[in-house]
Amino acid sequence: MLHLIYISIIVVLIIILISYTRKPKYFRITAPRSVALFHGIHPLKPKNYKTFSEEFETILNNAIEDGDFKGQLTEPCSYALRGGKYIRPIILMEIVRACQLQHSFGAPIYPAEAALAVEYFHVASLIIDDMPSFDNDVKRRNKDTVWARFGVAKAQMSALALTMQGFQNICRQIDWIKEHCPRFPDPNQLGALLCTFVSHSLNSAGSGQLVDTPEKTIPFFKIAFIMGWVLGTGTIEDIGMIERAAHCFGNAFQLADDIKDHDTDTGWNYAKIHGKRKTFDDVAQSLQECKKILHGKKIYTSIWNEIFQKVINVALGT
């Protein structure tokens, strides 16, 4: 009798595996959410920065309410995520939106889960960066840093929880596409490629944190740009050019930050070495190269003027 049960289980598993390889779109990698992340949002409607920021904040609040973080880590993770500029998820969402004006997959893609992922990864890096063993900062965004408020142990676990949940969000995004976008080409394969790319980028960011270089900033913009491009086009074609655009933007962002921190930074700072004037010129040059690439791919939209101006404002201290 026991052998019969084992054989029955094996047969059922074989049937499931065969069905999965033939019809992967019917199988979820993740459990469905109990609440919708967004209501009444038109994925293809042009938006300004303020509107995108408000939309993402709604998505973030709904994700936290739905239990993205559990137990004692709910409060520190939620605390860390509040009050950001959300520039990385906004970039990702806008690239997806702009790409879909040229590509159709049967239904518009709204990349809510992917946008959450890139913000979770970024905020996890900020928590680590503020720790006593790194920058030893007790203030960020005009409030206590996570470790200063909740302790080192909870801060470390929160960074880990944010990173793990980010990968879960990528998988949820792929599941959402499989359910809603019937003409999206091979979402499982692209999802696997995205997870591999993100893992590599996070490794680069971690290495950058250890030596305090721009490589701790640029990888998160690469994640935003490339995930946006892949989800918006359904392909990895021209991904090298998109990565270059991301590098230029991330470099400009880091250099602008170096100008802002010129008088307070105790570690490596490009503006201290090369001077504020030269650094500002490099910011402008990097943004111009990024703009040229985005124009070439027909994804430079009006919101980029706002995004670029925010980088300039950081450099100017306004």
Curated annotation (Swiss-Prot):
Gene Ontology cellular-component annotations: host cell endoplasmic reticulum; host cell membrane; membrane
Catalytic activity entry: isopentenyl diphosphate + dimethylallyl diphosphate = (2E)-geranyl diphosphate + diphosphate; isopentenyl diphosphate + (2E)-geranyl diphosphate = (2E,6E)-farnesyl diphosphate + diphosphate; isopentenyl diphosphate + (2E,6E)-farnesyl diphosphate = (2E,6E,10E)-geranylgeranyl diphosphate + diphosphate; isopentenyl diphosphate + (2E,6E,10E)-geranylgeranyl diphosphate = (2E,6E,10E,14E)-geranylfarnesyl diphosphate + diphosphate
Expression induction or repression: Expressed in the late phase of the viral replicative cycle.
Binding site for isopentenyl diphosphate: K85, R88, H122, R141
Superkingdom classification of source: Viruses
Membrane-crossing segments per the record: 1-21
PROSITE patterns per the UniProt record, alphabetical: POLYPRENYL_SYNTHASE_2 (PS00444)
Native organism: African swine fever virus (isolate Tick/South Africa/Pretoriuskop Pr4/1996) (ASFV)
Binding residues for Mg(2+) 2: D129, D135
Leader peptide range in chain numbering: none
Group of enzyme by EC: transferase
Subcellular location field: Host endoplasmic reticulum; Host membrane
The EC number(s) this enzyme carries: 2.5.1.-, 2.5.1.1, 2.5.1.29, 2.5.1.10
Positions that bind Mg(2+) 1: D129, D135
Protein name in the entry: Trans-prenyltransferase
Pathway(s) this gene product operates in, as recorded in its UniProt entry: Isoprenoid biosynthesis; farnesyl diphosphate biosynthesis; farnesyl diphosphate from geranyl diphosphate and isopentenyl diphosphate: step 1/1; Isoprenoid biosynthesis; geranyl diphosphate biosynthesis; geranyl diphosphate from dimethylallyl diphosphate and isopentenyl diphosphate: step 1/1; Isoprenoid biosynthesis; geranylgeranyl diphosphate biosynthesis; geranylgeranyl diphosphate from farnesyl diphosphate and isopentenyl diphosphate: step 1/1
Chain's role: Trans-prenyltransferase that catalyzes the sequential condensation of isopentenyl diphosphate (IPP) with different allylic diphosphates, such as dimethylallyl diphosphate (DMAPP), geranyl diphosphate (GPP), farnesyl diphosphate (FPP) and geranylgeranyl diphosphate (GGPP), farnesyl diphosphate being the best allylic substrate.
Molecular function in Gene Ontology: (2E,6E)-farnesyl diphosphate synthase activity; dimethylallyltranstransferase activity; geranylfarnesyl diphosphate synthase activity; geranylgeranyl diphosphate synthase activity; metal ion binding
Main localization (coarse): host cell
Gene3D superfamilies cross-referenced by the UniProt entry: Farnesyl Diphosphate Synthase (1.10.600.10)
